[in-house]
């Protein structure tokens, strides 16, 4: 009886261990708070308006599931928050990956820019429901010293020095990825776009180099911008457009998620199986992993890592 009791206790203890995460590695990155230096247009395409993209970089040191993000920007004074009707997020590798190389020559440089095209499996859009968002007013009257809106031109007309100051409502958009984004370790650009009925969203700059409460990292690159006339190229907001003795900018955003240190390697035959095994061990089972990472179900988690593992 004593032996049976001991075995039952051991089995029960093992079950508790399996139901508890072996380790928890939350991920959080932020560029900090807006510095009032510049507002750069980041706009979804709409009738009569060019798509315009502003992007800034971040680094992942391990495979990471990104479950949410925030962005901070300026909308026109008096604009209801409900007029923010669509948000899309794309992730880019750093040039020359996913790009034509040598590039077109239509911009001063492509070194350290976002790639020509986005990572297809990492695009999320509130339209089809792969992200949802909420908006809050941070400051009803916020000013920036300069803006970049329309003056996004091929060289030699790239230097406009900006389009002057602006005042508007400072808003934060909190984004939840209903299909979380799974990325291997690497250097990336984060590109949000916002559609505002009756106005535009000016993505607000943050200090560069990053200062508290931001998350500094070695290799921080400056922000880039393009519109549909400039595709597939990008311009540096500071060096190429503002120019002179140019400041360089970060943009105000944050990312939240969890790392998966023992995930498989994309393109390898055992990637999916190794990743799922790592998740089960890390979170104490796949149901707990799906819940903690923000997936709607175990099937959704499996699909997310299947896409991650494709070369």
Language model: regions and residue ranges:
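Soluble extracellular-acting proteins and domains
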Residues: 260-311
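Aromatic- and Gly/Pro-enriched, solvent-exposed loop/edge beta-strand patches characteristic
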Residues: 51, 75, 81-218
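PGST-rich, cysteine-poor low-complexity/disordered linker and tail segments that act as flexible spacers
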Residues: 208-260
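Bacterial N-terminal signal peptides
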Residues: 9-19
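Boundary/junction segments of secreted and surface-exposed precursor proteins
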Residues: 21-47, 104-106, 258-278
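A short beta-strand-loop element at or near the start of a globular domain
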Residues: 35-77
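Bacterial N-terminal signal peptides that target proteins for export
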Residues: 1-10
């Amino acid at each position: 009886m004593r032996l049976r009791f001991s075995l039952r206790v051991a089995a029960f203890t093992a079950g508790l261990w399996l139901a508890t995460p072996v380790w928890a590695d939350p991920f959080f990155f932020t560029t900090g708070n807006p510095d009032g230096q510049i507002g750069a247009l980041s706009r979804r395409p709409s009738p009569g308006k060019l798509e315009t993209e502003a992007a800034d970089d971040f680094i992942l040191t391990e495979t990471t599931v990104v479950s949410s993000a925030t962005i901070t920007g300026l909308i026109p004074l008096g604009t209801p928050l409900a007029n923010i009707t669509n948000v899309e997020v794309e992730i880019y590798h750093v040039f020359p990956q996913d790009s034509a190389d040598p590039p077109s020559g239509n911009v001063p440089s492509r070194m350290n820019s976002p790639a020509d095209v986005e990572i297809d499996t990492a695009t999320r859009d509130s339209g089809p429901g792969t992200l949802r968002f909420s908006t809050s007013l941070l400051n009803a009257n916020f000013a920036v010293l300069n803006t970049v809106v329309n003056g996004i031109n091929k060289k030699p007309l790239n230097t406009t020095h900006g389009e002057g100051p602006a005042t508007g409502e400072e808003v934060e958009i909190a984004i939840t990825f209903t299909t979380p984004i799974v990325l291997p370790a690497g250097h990336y650009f984060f590109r949000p776009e916002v559609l505002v009925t009756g106005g535009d969203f000016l993505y607000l700059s943050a200090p560069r180099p990053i200062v508290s409460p931001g998350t500094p990292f070695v290799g921080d690159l400056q922000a880039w911008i393009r519109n549909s006339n400039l595709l597939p190229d990008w311009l540096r907001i500071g060096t190429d457009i503002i120019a002179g003795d140019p400041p360089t900018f970060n943009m105000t955003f944050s990312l939240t998620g969890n790392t998966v240190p023992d995930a498989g390697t994309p393109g390898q035959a055992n990637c999916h199986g190794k990743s799922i095994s790592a998740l089960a061990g890390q979170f104490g089972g796949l149901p707990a992993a799906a819940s903690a990472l923000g997936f709607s179900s175990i099937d959704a988690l499996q699909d997310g890592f299947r896409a991650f593992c494709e070369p």
